[in-house]
């Protein structure tokens, strides 16, 4: 019950954040309209340098065009970007106020919200699902085909397990009785098991799928878990990453937050439309090898989802996580 209350509180917080950002993006009153505002016009918000972190991987890929453009004002750069190797490098800095925004896993956003009692809030979804069932063979054409099979995977007790178990259950498959889930410590162990022939089916995220395909002849993406989730048609979505911000920063600099979201959306559009050039930047920033990025990008589901669509998709996904690990 406690987790459920926190979940609904998170939904309300999302609504508050979106209203703040929307207000920041409203156009100014037309001075020629003949209308006199009831209150004095506020001065334009002074430019501020937003400190933004992202984890190396798909959740950082949509940022590369914005990072490369390095927009600035008379006061200096608008953004100070940091790329981190793990969430452990980002979480303390965000809580201490050393960062203003961050691209993090969706489940971590919920943890941060609860841990800080609302001091960290969600602004946007930036990555949908990146999980795939891969197979060295042709036996798996649907989730039902996993019955009686062994699937090697990493991420027990986290999103990969919760997402797979949820999808199996929703498709009438008992994940404990109908499928053998062989959990490994790292995704690289799953790739090794496939390469050695010890396993023929695995659950892997991008870009590990692309890396595995480069090493194993005939390995194919049998099932896209994002598509399987969408088939449920329940209004939610399989979500990998979100953009979070400190509540204090959002309240103090709503225009800066609104401008960042607009710039980020444009960066995402460019990345998705210019795969080769985007992959080169991704490699240049050390996020993922450029050759791997070019092949993986079309399957990484890089997005910028805000507004009503965010309020529809994210709570439904988080509810699945809470039900799996209340």
Tell me the role of every PLM-derived stretch:
Residues 30-32, 36-176, 180-183, 200-206, ...:
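Short, glycine-/small- and polar/acidic-enriched structural segments
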Residues 70-77, 227-236, 303-311:
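Short, solvent-exposed loop/beta-turn-alpha elements that line the ligand-binding surface or hinge
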